[in-house]
A protein has these predicted regions:
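Periplasmic c-type cytochrome electron-transfer domains
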Residues: 3, 7-15, 27-721
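Hydrophobic membrane-insertion alpha-helices, especially the h-region
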Residues: 19-27
Length: 721
């Protein structure tokens, strides 16, 4: 059955769809209701933080260049790579109740993604000491075989056992009793959708997710010969995994033919959409942050005002200096609060978190995650709070990784000292005002002639790059930066939303952004856009750090600028850097409208029947999927992905979409004819779009007016960062 026939079948039952949609709304609202006062599993079991001891052994000694760490720093690195904070409960829940998308246990099975292809396909780091399995385990799963035991000191009851993939830990499922064992079939688990989409299916393992999943990656100055088989010495703890394929990792069950498949397929490698759960109704994946020079970031941090539930976090003050990690600066309450929020965002205390928002679809309004409630009712929260200070201590030890120290790195530098000297001057006069943590005196404007003279002297100091964060860590309006605005308009941290307690009053008081113009790719006109959220907070980007810029391409906050080589060797990184930096400084080389994420196939809105109310299950096809609508090939992904219609807009859209699909079916229109009919809906779709900014590689035009020789000189200096 082709897409148009499928659309036609949906149209014949459109009355049932409309009625079912109402049931679905009620169903989701009920599912999101808070019932009683939830506590986490550890609290329910009568455990305390003493039941979750920290690991004192230097488990990962060869990593990060073999640096010597204090006992506090060792415990911090161990927690960063191993501690899942009880989120195995959330990811097991997600496998049973994510509309047939998420299943981490299946993703780890070699029948889905073989170990010898894991880095290429998924971008994940295989754990040293494992090999591909030669036979299934006792549950019929083909998980990696461990050939070298983990170092002593890891309590599997607390940290799980290794899966063969760094950051993913396996815990016995407490619900896997004798009845569950009798119903378990490892073969059907992989191949039978009706079996593995059964909400009552109990898996033998829960999978915990540690921060290392997204942050451990090949060390640029000691890359593995084979990225599918790294040694511990080839890995860096917090550089940010710019190779991860988030869609395939966290939604391995997503099926072709559905819009969600197309949306994830368009997502750049090395990016993560941390506001997909809880959703902010903007598809805004962004590059995973590297973490370096935390001490310098603390030194230059600006003061921000705190209020409300934020002050329930121990150590918070009414006003304090705040370094940031998130691109938009929404994590504005200090290191401890920012780190704890990340753990919640990946599933800690999901018993409470999931009562505050409607996961994935977001049909019900969000409620704030209250710090005071978590402190009282979650042992995992308190155990994590005991760890975040040690994690921060470890971060303070992480230094930049220089090209000159990488194998063959010196061959990529110019030997012309005049060119290098000119590059320093160009940087001083055009870049350092934003991209340096060493700044002019407070009474000197860095953009003034006096400020530029100050930077010329500073940049030529041999110690200028030492402990320089290469950013002033200040937020600027997206109207100034002009990069794609989707991440800047994230709303989860605004007042009353899920991360309300984790953003400062200073963040919430930022001036709203107005006067935006975005390209309408359908008629090539520019339209004025007024953000729906008129309160303070969204609409800003922090200055990106240029630390390790030679190793971190593609560039920009969304990894949209430059070629993704998938090659962590020095040559592979430099190929990506050279392509990206040329496109940054010579914008005529960019893809422009070619960077718009588009559907590569005709598709439909698609849900597995097992995850919807009974009234909607009747319209599922033979493949078990409910397909509604027809989305043409080449549709901008974010035309659909960023929809957040008001009630009135939803009614208009529903009527017009129904009429269009009915006409397509009645006249048996071709794919081209159907596309032409659906294009008429674009004005309504744009009006209901929370961020209709579709061109991904735009913006940051600073320095593009330099001469070619100055640009080349600047590039040479950037390689030294």
């Amino acid at each position: 059955m082709n897409a148009l026939q499928s659309a036609g079948r949906s149209i014949k039952t459109v009355g049932m769809v409309v009625a079912g949609a109402g049931c679905l709304l009620i169903f989701c609202a009920i599912a999101a209701c808070r019932q009683g006062e939830p506590v986490d599993e550890a609290a329910a079991a009568g455990l305390t933080t003493t039941d979750f001891p920290q690991i004192t052994a230097d488990i990962f000694k060869p990593m990060d260049g073999g640096i010597e760490l204090s006992s506090e720093e060792i415990m911090g690195r161990n927690a960063w790579i191993l501690w899942s904070a009880g989120n195995q409960r959330f990811w097991d829940f997600a496998a049973r109740d994510s509309y047939g998308l998420i299943d981490l246990l299946k993703m780890l099975d070699n029948r889905k993604y073989p170990r010898e292809q894991r880095f290429r396909i998924l971008g994940l780091m295989n754990e040293p000491g494992f090999r591909a399995p030669g036979k299934p385990d006792k549950f019929g799963l083909w998980l990696d075989d461990q050939v070298t035991p983990e170092p002593a000191g890891i309590d599997e009851k607390v940290y799980g056992k290794p899966s063969g993939v760094i950051g993913f830990r396996l815990f016995p499922n407490p619900e896997f009793d004798e009845q569950a064992r009798q119903q378990w079939d490892g073969g059907r688990f992989m191949h039978d959708p009706a079996y593995y989409n059964n909400r009552k299916l109990v898996r033998p393992y829960r999978v915990g997710v540690a921060c290392g999943v997204c942050h451990v990656a090949p060390n640029p100055v000691n890359p593995p010969e084979n990225p599918e088989s790294p040694g511990w010495e080839n890995l860096a703890s917090a550089i940010g995994n710019q190779y991860i394929n988030e869609g395939k990792v966290f939604a391995c069950n997503v099926e072709k033919g559905g819009f969600f498949y197309e949306m994830l397929a368009a997502q750049p490698r090395g990016t993560s959409d941390t506001s997909r759960i809880a959703t902010d109704h903007i598809n805004n994946p962004n590059a995973i942050n590297p973490i370096f020079l935390l001490g310098e970031r603390e030194r230059i941090a600006a003061r921000e005002k705190m209020a409300g539930g934020t002050l329930d976090l121990p150590g918070e003050e009414n006003e304090m200096n705040v370094p940031h990690i998130l691109k938009d600066g929404g994590d504005s309450i200090g290191i401890a609060g920012a780190a704890l929020r990340v753990y919640v965002n990946i599933g800690m205390f999901s018993e409470y978190w999931l009562t505050l928002h409607d996961k994935l679809i977001g049909l019900t309004p969000q409620k704030p995650f209250e710090i005071a409630y978590a402190r009282k009712h979650s042992v995992y929260w308190r155990a994590t709070a005991e760890r975040v200070g040690k994690i921060a201590a470890f971060f303070r030890r992480l230094k930049p990784l220089h090209l000159k120290d990488a194998p063959g790195g010196v061959s990529f530098f110019t030997s012309d000292e005049t060119v290098m000297a000119r590059g320093k001057t160009v940087f001083a006069e055009n870049c350092a005002g934003c991209h340096s943590s060493k700044q002019t005196p407070s009474d000197v404007d860095p953009r003034s002639p006096e400020g530029k003279a100050w930077f010329r002297t500073a940049v030529n100091d041999p110690g200028f790059l030492d402990d320089n964060f290469l950013s002033n860590d200040r937020p600027y309006p997206v109207t100034t930066i002009k990069t794609n605005s989707a991440r800047a308009f994230a709303t989860n941290a605004v007042a009353g939303h899920v991360w309300d307690n984790f953003s400062s009053q200073t963040y919430k008081g930022r001036a709203p952004i107005e006067g935006l113009e975005f390209l309408n790719p359908f008629d090539q006109t520019h339209r004025t856009f007024k953000p729906r959220v008129t309160t303070g907070g969204p609409g800003y980007y922090r200055t990106a750090s240029l630390i390790n810029v030679w190793s971190s391409a593609p560039l920009l906050h969304n990894n949209s600028l430059g070629e993704f080589t998938g090659d962590p060797s020095v040559a592979g990184r430099m190929k990506a850097f050279n392509d990206a930096i040329e496109k940054l400084l010579w914008p005529e080389k960019r893809l422009g409208q070619g960077s718009i994420w588009r559907t590569q196939n005709e598709c439909a809105l698609q849900l597995r029947k097992e995850f919807v109310p009974a009234i909607l299950q009747k319209i599922a096809g033979g493949d078990g999927c409910i397909k509604i609508g027809f989305i043409p090939k080449g549709t901008p992904v974010n035309l659909i992905g960023n929809l957040e219609p008001s009630v009135g807009q939803l009614a208009v859209l529903q009527a017009k979409i129904t009429a269009a699909l009915t006409k397509i079916h009645a006249k048996n229109l071709s794919s081209g004819g159907a596309t032409a009919e659906l294009i008429k809906l674009v004005p309504e779709l744009l009006a209901a779009n929370k961020c209709p900014d579709f061109v991904e590689d735009e913006g940051h035009y600073f320095g593009t007016d330099l001469s070619d020789s100055d640009k080349r000189a600047l590039i040479e200096f950037l390689k030294t960062f």
